[in-house]
Amino acid sequence: QRALRTAKQAKDEIAGPLRIVGPRSAFQPVLWPLIDEFCQRYPDVVPDVQLEDRVGNWVEDRVDVGFRLGLSPHEGLIARRLLPVQLIICASPEYLKAYGAPETIAALQSHRCSAFRNPGTGQIVPWRLRSGNDEVEQPVVPAICTNDETLELSAVLAGRVLGQLAGLTAAPYIRAKQLVPLLVDHIPDRYSYFVYYGSRNAQPARARAFIDLVLERLVDNSKYVLSMKE
C-alpha cells in the first residue's frame, strides 16, 4: 500500500522531465511562449523538446505530448485540434513595387518564388492552393530553395521572392504591414494543427497540466489566425 501511495504521489506531482515533440517548421513562435509560461508555473518541470519534421515513433521516443500539422495524427492516440493551418502567399511591399502582384494562380509561373525543401524527406514541397472546392498542388520555379523556414522568411521580407508561409509565421508581419497577403481566395482550409497524447489515465500530472495549458491558450486563438479582413 505504501509503495502504491508513493507511486501515485510521484505521478500526481507536477515535476520531472516532460518530453515534447513537434514540427520544426512553423511551430516555434507558438511553442516557446507555452513552455515559458508553463515553467514559470511549475519550475520543477524539465522540458525536453525535440523539433523535427519527421513523424517519429510515439513509444520508442517516449513522448508525453506531441504537436503535428496536417491531417489528424496517428490512430491509437488522442488528438485535439488547435488551429487551422493557413498557407498564405505573401510578398513584401518592395517586391510588389518591383514586380507587381499575381492576379491568378497561373500568374505565379512568371513570378520569383521561394520553395521549401522538407528537411525530413529532402523533397521540395509544392504550394497548396484552393481552387473552387478542391485543393491543388501548384509547382513553382524557385528563385530560392531552402530547408530552413527562417531563411525563407528573410528572403520574402527582403523583397527578393514571393513565399507561401504558414499563417503562424506570417501573421505578425502582415499585421505590421511588412508583408502583403496575395490570392487570399485560394488559401487552403483542409489542414490543422493538433496536440496529441496517450490515455489521460496513464499520464503524469505534468503532462496533463501542460495539455490543459495548450488547449486554454491555443484553440482557435485569433492571435495566430488571420481573419479575411486582415
Predicted regions and their residues:
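A ligand-binding cleft/hinge motif common to bilobed small-molecule-binding domains
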Residues: 153-178
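Alpha-helical "hinge/linker" immediately C-terminal to small N-terminal DNA-binding modules
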Residues: 1-12
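Flexible hinge/capping segments at coil-to-helix
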Residues: 76-87, 91-116, 132
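Short beta-strand-to-loop elements that line the ligand-binding cleft
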Residues: 47-51, 115, 137-148, 186
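C-terminal effector-binding regulatory domain of bacterial HTH transcription factors
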Residues: 40, 44, 167-176, 186-230
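Central regulatory/effector-binding core of bacterial HTH transcription factors
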Residues: 16-75, 227-230
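Short beta-strand->loop
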Residues: 79-82, 176-188
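Ligand-binding cleft/hinge of the Venus flytrap
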Residues: 20, 38, 125-139, 173
